[in-house]
Every structure is written in C-alpha cells, then in structure tokens.
Amino acid sequence: MLPTRMLYDFQTQTFLSDGVLSPIELIRRAVVNGYSGLAITDHVGAGGIEPLLERLREDCHIAQEEWGIPVFPGVELTHLPPKLISSTAQRARDA
C-alpha cells in the first residue's frame, strides 16, 4: 500500500504583502487543490506585525473550523536593519 500523499506549503503570501489573494481565498484554493496544511507568511517590517497576525489568525481559525485544514499564521521579516532583526523576531514570536 502506498503512503497517503500529504502536501504542505509553509511559505505563502496574500495581498496583505506581495501576494494577490485574500488570506481566506488562498486557504480555500489550497483546500480545493488537496493541500493538507498551509502557513501564511506575509512580508512585514518592524511595524505592523501585530495587526497582520491578528488578521491572519481569524482566517486561519475559520479554515480549521470549516474545512479542517491546519493553517499557521506567520510573518516573513524583510528589509530590517541588522540590529533590529533579533528584537523584531522576538516581537513576532510574542504576538
């Protein structure tokens, strides 16, 4: 017997950064295309981490409840001065 295929994508973006789909539409398309799980990792700088993650969490929760797919909200930190990377990453983890 062949193992069940599991398909995940942990590096996706929505129109909240440089993607073209809303978070819920990105998730819906992943479900339709047979994905087992997803992470949404929109680009963000030092500002805006908390509002972005709050927005993503809501759609991730809806996806889990309605479609049974685990979706993990995250951020991809971009264009930060090197001295801010550590503290900004900690803020993202704490958010």
For every predicted segment, state its role.
Residues 1, 22, 71:
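Catalytic core of pol beta-like nucleotidyltransferases
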Residues 1-2, 33-36, 59-63:
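A broad, low-specificity signal for short, low-complexity segments enriched in glycine/proline
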Residues 9, 27-50, 68-76, 95:
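Divalent metal-dependent hydrolysis catalytic cores, especially in the metallo-beta-lactamase
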Residues 18-19, 46-51, 79-83:
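Acidic-and-aromatic substrate-binding clefts and catalytic sites of carbohydrate-active enzymes
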Residues 19-30, 81-91:
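Short, acidic/polar
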Residues 53-95:
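Extended substrate/RNA-proximal surfaces in nucleic-acid metabolism proteins
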